[in-house]
Amino acid sequence: RYGERTQLEFDALVYHAVALSGVTGRRPRIGLLGTASGDPQWFSYRAIEAGRVAGFDVSTLDLFPMPNHADPAAYLLDQDVVWVNGGSVANLLAVWQVHDLEPAFRAAWAAGVVLAGVSAGSICWFDGGCTDSFGPDLRAVTNGLGLLPYGNGVHYDSEERRRPTIHALVGDGTLGVTHCTD
């Protein structure tokens, strides 16, 4: 959302992720990944500016057209929070697989880096969920990173087709226990 002096202002969820990191005495480091929407530079610039105003050091790990860090795994480990934006979870997971980032995310998670995000950036940490990545009809995605061994039903209340789709996917066994959020 727009801030008082910026074109983007972080919401409470970002501040919560930073609080979970436990950082004190220095500016928290937030690594922003916009893979799910093709690493849009305009959003990265706005997020970096919003971070400056909020007292955070925000940087990006871009994978389009090629990684902007020589060692993405080291970059992830150097963050306090890794924040993944929304977009196409199917494309996000495919690009991460091609770049072999799953071990890097697992290492960051094991090291205590807070892994967070919204929409596609939330589903990715779970076993899967339902997505419109393939078109207007919602479909299952079941190849999430599985750091949280559950399904994830994003937009559960705000998009009327999400709830019945998640219920059907849990009912037919495509997804196991599923946590839903909005």
What are these regions (language model features)?
Residues 91-95, 99-161:
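Class I SAM-dependent methyltransferase SAM-binding "motif I" and its flanking Rossmann-like core
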Residues 1-27, 32-45, 49-52, 129-131, ...:
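C-terminal and late-domain segments of enzyme folds
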Residues 84, 118, 181:
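A conserved hydrophobic position in a structured secondary element of the catalytic/binding core
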Residues 59-114:
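Flexible gly/pro-rich beta->alpha loop and the following alpha-helix that scaffold active-site loops
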Residues 26, 55-57, 78:
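Short loop/turn motifs at secondary-structure junctions
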Residues 39, 67, 124:
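Flexible, glycine-rich phosphate/dinucleotide-binding loops
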Residues 36, 88, 120:
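Active-site metal-binding loops of divalent metal-dependent hydrolases
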